[in-house]
Amino acid sequence: LMEGAKAKDVEDFLKSAIKGTEWENKVFAVGGFVRDEIMGKTPKDIDVVVDKIQGGIEFTIWLAKKVGTYKEGSNPTIFPTFGTAKMVLDGVVHNGVDLSGEDLEAVMPRSEQYHDSSSRKPTDIQFTDLEGDAKRRDLTINAIYKNVSTGEIVDPVGGMEDIKNKVVRPPSDPDLIYTDDALRMFRVIRFANRFGWELTP
């Protein structure tokens, strides 16, 4: 996990790394990073959605090669089922800040189906757009996207409004989301308690 300013440094590093490349305007910060920023807190770590089929995987491989830290099979670590990859930023220095010890998780926008109610593993994963991706997330406030290249906010399920009104709610049918994943239920309650916000079914 990243501390304070480092997450912003990673965002800045990403912005300059993708400038003028095929990845420009395809990389979006999401989740806690965007939520904390909007709430005026210092983001702790950064996760990104890369808007392309297998984008998370292709992007981190490209990035690791670009900065010279690519190691087949270990950096990035790849989770092919989910179209997800995790890259460590050891040895990367950006604007005089050493990003060693930070990591970057990148995913493609995806929709998920859980057919086996006893399992937390989705069985059917499809590439989708940001709106589809937002709907699979646990809370609207964690489903706000920030274009790393432009800073533009994409808010498909009304997360900004919910932050303003201090409301914690799921982005789509709660039964669907929480049947999918009971652990999420606990996260939601934890969030509501942490911020002292209202829980909306």
Which residues make up each language-model segment?
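Catalytic cores of the polymerase beta-like nucleotidyltransferase superfamily
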Residues: L1-P201
